[in-house]
């Protein structure tokens, strides 16, 4: 393992949409879910002032109010808010599949909060984020680690789906039993 700076293994992706935004998914800070590594929400309309482009595999880092711990990997190309820093892996230095996990961690967010400026809506700049230092294994270990972390994330998501389905089943059974006992109870609920 060797110590590296984030700026040694990743760059800020700076690309702007110069033409029509039609067909591009739009991602705002509200679409980044705290402590979730995958992006699951976005808008489809082009009615906004955003012009910052991101590419599939880039990490979208919520630079405003970093204490909210918002960072997710992009599953597609799109356009995002200026309050999102788009981070791209240097594939010869870090496995792109591992980068989201190196960014979505408490130590980096603590570092980001410490470097943020502003009182009502503190923001951190890439110029500061790139100086975040962390341990990085060789490429072989990075591959093993990325596979393990993605498997864990997929397992977590499967459990979340199971819990949601169980919750819906319990609700339907509960309301079904109320209907059988007397329809007047439904109106009270």
Model-derived segments and their meaning:
Residues 64, 78-85, 117-140:
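A short glycine-rich beta-alpha junction/loop motif
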Residues 157:
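Conserved glycine-bearing catalytic or ligand-binding loops at nucleotide- and phosphate-handling centers
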Residues 1-17, 131-146, 154, 162-189:
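Non-catalytic DNA-recognition/assembly elements of restriction-modification systems
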Residues 4-17, 22-56, 189:
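Sequence-specific dsDNA recognition surfaces
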Residues 50-52, 59-104:
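A short beta-sheet element
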